[in-house]
Design a protein with these regions (language model features):
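Structural signature of the thiamine diphosphate
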Residues: 1-49, 204, 214-250, 443-465
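Thiamine diphosphate
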Residues: 1-9, 91-239, 249-349, 352-402, 671-687, 696-706, ...
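Conserved thiamine diphosphate
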Residues: 1-20, 32, 44-47, 197-211, ...
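Conformationally flexible catalytic loops at phosphate/diphosphate-handling active centers
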Residues: 14-109, 470
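Glycine-/acidic-rich phosphate or pyrophosphate-binding loops and their flanking alpha/beta elements
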Residues: 95-118, 131, 246-260, 523-524, ...
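Active-site cofactor/cluster-binding pocket
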Residues: 154-159, 167-170, 174-185, 259-269, ...
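Ferredoxin-type iron-sulfur electron-transfer modules and their immediate structural context
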Residues: 421, 434-595, 602-687, 691-814, ...
Length: 835
């Protein structure tokens, strides 16, 4: 309202901006304005003037002219009075809103002690966390405050000075941005300039960076700012052991108002947990007088990744714009998480833990790690289980466990009386699924009833108090792999995958300061997220390889084995004679721990006489077959097999190594099979320019890098620039390659013309003959390099060519991007075909 009115009267455009996921992805119970209360503050004369000044052929003018150096500067300065007047116009409309609604909006709002000695200046969502922290500190007698920036441009020095208490002895400015090479960040420099020569001229001004990439900013970190006397430049929320800018924060503080209920839910992407929690927050917000807040935190995996839902409820307004680390209720919706993440450790004493699992007491003893048992027992945690997957299957909902577990939450949390909660959930289910028919609605009703009735309270054994800490489960790391990727996995990926990436110091990234990541780290994740995986039935297999062709994650692969390799295979690994090559054996192997269970392979399998060669079976029961896949990966690709069936066919292409494997794409993804196939055909000599979008997230979302390398260390070289410039970015990569190769070609031409060594001369000529053919130029390049290394001559061309040997061979340049980058959203390419 203020921005619209001020834009009309001030004749200048405004930008209302969010500061990231914390704002855009949060659900909050708010008070709304009634436009009837606000319409009379609109300046109708300003609207009439705006319309009269608008472009119109009845009174035409031209705007946006090209201006030459003689007048451009003067024309730009002519707008100064408009910017000078704008702060006053904005404050005028803020005053009108305040008068109508009882609010207190100013260009700069102060909150805190009247006699504050340390004041933070900040803007955006962090201000709510700062206010909550101020309440906590001032209750203990500390003299602190915050100035919240509401109008950033034009920046009013006068309004800022008026907002700061005269008692201030120190100012800390927080910026949520980083401008490398600058003397300070933008807000800090504005504050310094505004206070220069004012009554606060002698007050020291500190500058801090926070929240980059949605890094969480907590009350403990804000306390560290107020208690900071040492670092005039600092960072929050990280451990900077390289430039030593970070402030050390103490243990998590509980600064929320008394009576606030904090709940955290761990789910699996696409299992419905996030959607269920959105419904829960709306049910509570709409049907009680409680304030409610929900925020959803998840990794960059598509469906199948970890999701964490943070819900807060209370009688007081909720200002906590940070993640929950001190919870009253924690729910784990996926039993495989119990030994992967520290979940129960975030419960306060006496809190409630709900685990979705099929285990009875014997199963809990077997599967729960010692540290989980000990925490539950020693902190008086109320422990409950429910078999949501079993309930969902019995009802007909399959793997959608969200409604079952939502009902269990309402029963245990006791935020709303159980009967009322069930009634409200059923009403929400009717509204959501009513169009899909009574059967679907009834299934959800049954799930709601079952979730409330089938929760099992676990009597915690006394022996759990002394259970030993077993640590978190991490996938086995093959020490025989490439050192660069093993170091990356050990030092970074393992921590990040355990949801402990926030603990990594800056020094962990010094080798990756340019943004690079090693290829092939996704192979070390072994997430084990599938409920069912494909099981090969060799008697029904026609060896078509369609299953491997359509697999989005390269987890199912055909293997061609010699008789000796088949004999040395792990016990139980089946193989059959290869059709067309009777001296070879054929097998289909599946990576159980990388499969997402989409079933695309089983769906496409033609089988024999109506019987599939792939059937979906329980993952846990068949996890031992992972050894078959691991053995198959060690078997080298056989060129004679690829040649026999031709790499340009579905069958032949799948005997080549995929250089895109185990990505974070959705189960059943339609993009990755194409990209995977391209890497099988061109991957050893492939450049990829990737537009920002889905393909860049499954393609390289740190720390998981699915593009990998051959045993010789060759593979796709991948880079991402922006969303909109990918065509130019990829074209630039091609031009750079051409420029380098053309220069090297000139050197090879000299060798072909007058080299004394006949081997060098012949190799140089073969290189030139294949110069534009990617399929053959690589082999010719290898011959040329070998001849140069063996010739013993000292020609200048030799040294230059060997120094640049990686650039000699013809490469394959690709540009990947989605429909957005291609200006094709909603058209499926039809517009481009017709054009």
């Amino acid at each position: 309202q203020v921005a619209h009115c001020a834009a009309l009267e001030g004749k200048l455009p405004f930008i209302n901006f969010f500061d990231g996921f914390r704002t855009s992805h949060e659900i909050q119970k708010i008070e709304t304005w009634d436009y009837e209360d606000l319409k009379d503050m609109v300046n109708m004369d300003a609207i009439d003037e705006f319309r009269a000044h608008a472009l119109n052929p009845n009174h035409p003018c031209l705007r946006g002219s090209a201006q030459n150096p003689d007048i451009f500067f003067q024309a730009r300065e002519a707008c100064n009075p408009y910017y000078d007047a704008l702060p006053g116009i904005v404050q005028n409309y803020m005053d009108k809103v305040n008068e109508k609604l009882g609010t207190n909006y100013k260009l700069f709002n102060y909150y805190g002690a009247e006699d504050a000695e340390h004041v933070i200046v900040a803007m955006g969502s962090v201000c709510d966390t700062i206010e909550e922290t101020i309440d906590y500190l001032t209750a203990a007698g500390e003299k602190v405050g915050v100035v919240k920036v509401r109008l950033y441009r034009p920046f009013s020095a006068e309004a800022l000075i008026d907002a700061i208490p005269d008692s201030v002895k120190k100012i800390s400015v927080l910026d949520r941005t980083k401008e490398p090479g600058a003397l300070g960040e933008p807000l800090y420099l504005d504050v310094v300039a505004a206070l220069k020569g004012s009554k606060f001229d002698a007050v020291p001004i500190y500058t801090g960076r926070y929240g980059l990439g949605s890094k969480d900013t907590t009350p403990a970190q804000i306390v560290a700012v107020y208690h900071n006397d040492e670092k005039a430049k600092f960072t929050l929320g990280i451990v900077d052991d390289v430039t030593n800018l970070s402030l050390k924060a103490d243990e998590p503080l509980v600064t929320t108002p008394e009576g606030t209920i904090n709940c955290k839910f761990w789910g699996l992407g696409a299992d419905g947990t996030v959607g269920a929690n959105k419904n829960s927050i709306k049910i509570i917000g709409d049907n009680t007088d409680m304030y409610a807040q929900a925020y959803f935190d998840y990794d960059s995996k598509k469906s199948g990744g970890v999701t964490m839902s943070h819900l807060r409820f209370g009688k007081s307004p909720i200002k906590s714009t940070y993640l929950i680390h001190q919870a009253n209720f924690v729910a784990c919706h996926n039993p495989s998480y119990v030994d992967k993440y520290n979940m129960v450790q975030e419960l306060v004493d006496g809190g409630t833990f709900l685990l979705n699992c099929p285990w009875d007491m014997e199963g809990l003893e077997k599967h729960l790690p010692g540290q989980v048992k000990a925490y539950i027992a020693n902190h008086n945690i109320k422990f409950y289980t429910i078999d949501g997957i079993k309930i969902g299957k019995e009802i007909g909902l399959g793997g959608r466990i969200n409604t079952v577990l939502q009902s269990a939450f309402f029963k245990l949390a006791e935020i709303i009386p159980e009967e009322e909660a069930i009634s409200l959930m059923k009403a929400a289910a009717k509204a959501t699924y009513g169009r899909k028919g009574d059967k679907i609605v009834q299934m959800n009703y049954d799930a709601i009833d079952a979730g409330a009735k089938q929760v099992v309270e676990i009597e915690v054994p006394e022996s759990w108090k002394d259970a030993a800490d077993e640590g978190l489960a991490v996938p086995h790391i093959d020490e025989n792999g490439r050192k660069d990727v093993i170091d990356f996995v050990k030092n970074i990926q393992t921590k990040v995958n355990a949801q402990e990436g926030n603990s990594l110091p800056v020094s962990a990234f010094t080798d990756y300061a340019d943004g690079s990541t090693p290829s092939g780290s996704s192979a070390y994740e072994k997430r084990g997220i599938a409920v069912d995986i494909p099981i090969w039935q060799p008697d029904n297999c026609i060896q078509c390889n369609r299953c491997a062709y359509v697999c989005p994650h390269a987890v199912i692969r055909p293997v061609a084995l010699t008789e000796e390799e088949a004999a040395n295979a792990p016990e139980g690994m089946q193989s059959i004679p290869m059709i067309g090559m009777p001296d070879m054996k054929f097998a289909i192997t599946v990576s159980a721990y990388d499969c997402t269970g989409c079933g695309s392979c089983a769906n496409v399998c033609p089988g024999k006489k109506g019987e599939k060669a792939l059937v979906m079976g329980n993952m846990e029961e068949n996890a031992g077959k992972q050894t078959f896949f691991d053995y198959g990966r060690e078997i080298p690709v056989k060129p004679e097999v690829v040649a026999k069936y031709k790499e340009t066919t579905v069958k032949g292409s799948q005997f080549k190594q995929p250089l895109l494997e185990f990505s974070g794409a959705c189960a059943g993804c339609g993009e990755t099979p194409y990209a995977k196939l391209i890497t099988q055909l061109f991957g050893e000599r492939m450049y990829i320019a990737n537009a920002t979008g889905c393909s860049s997230i499954w393609g390289n979302s740190s720390p998981s890098t699915p593009y990998t390398v051959t045993p010789e260390g060759k593979g796709p070289a991948w880079s991402n620039s922006l969303f909109e410039d990918n065509a130019e970015f990829g074209y630039g990569m091609l031009l750079a390659q051409n420029t380098i190769r053309n220069r090297l070609k000139g050197l090879v031409e000299k060798l072909a013309a007058d080299a004394e060594n006949e081997d060098v001369k012949a190799a140089a000529q073969e290189y030139l003959d294949t110069y534009t053919c990617g399929a053959t130029n690589g082999t010719a390049t290898d011959k040329l390099v070998a001849a140069l290394e063996a010739c013993g001559c000292d020609r200048a061309e030799k040294a230059e060519l060997l120094k640049n040997k990686d650039f000699l061979a013809k490469k394959s340049q690709w540009i990947f991007g989605g429909d957005g980058w291609a200006y094709d959203i909603g058209f499926g390419g039809v517009d481009h075909v017709l054009a």
